[in-house]
Curated annotation (Swiss-Prot):
PROSITE patterns cross-referenced by the UniProt entry: RIBOSOMAL_S18
Source organism of the structure: Ralstonia nicotianae (strain ATCC BAA-1114 / GMI1000) (Ralstonia solanacearum)
Protein name per its UniProtKB record: Small ribosomal subunit protein bS18
Gene Ontology BP annotations: translation
PANTHER family documented for this protein: 30S RIBOSOMAL PROTEIN S18 (PTHR13479), SMALL RIBOSOMAL SUBUNIT PROTEIN BS18M (PTHR13479:SF40)
Residues of the signal peptide: none
InterPro entries: Ribosomal_bS18, Ribosomal_bS18_CS, Ribosomal_bS18_sf
Subunit note: Part of the 30S ribosomal subunit. Forms a tight heterodimer with protein bS6.
Lineage of producing organism: Bacteria, Pseudomonadati, Pseudomonadota, Betaproteobacteria, Burkholderiales
Record's function text: Binds as a heterodimer with protein bS6 to the central domain of the 16S rRNA, where it helps stabilize the platform of the 30S subunit.
GO cellular component, one term: cytosolic small ribosomal subunit
Amino acid sequence: MNKKQRDAKNKKRFQQQNPLFKRKKFCRFTVAGVEQIDYKDLDTLKDFIGENGKITPARLTGTRSHYQRQLDTAIKRARFLALMPYTDQHKH
């Protein structure tokens, strides 16, 4: 193993152990080549909803603004059509 490979391996190990390490954000939709986000794709939409039912902002998810607007619209449509809940599961 040469020095370059060893340094890369040590860097990766340090990043995994460091609790303050932040992974570089990227847009999932750009990587996948998605053109339009569909309101019927509930599995994808649920990934962008927080525990309390709020839409997660792009600065936290890394989603590009073009796709974030489509994502917001798709989530709102799914909520309006009762495909998704507006809030989390309340227990009275």
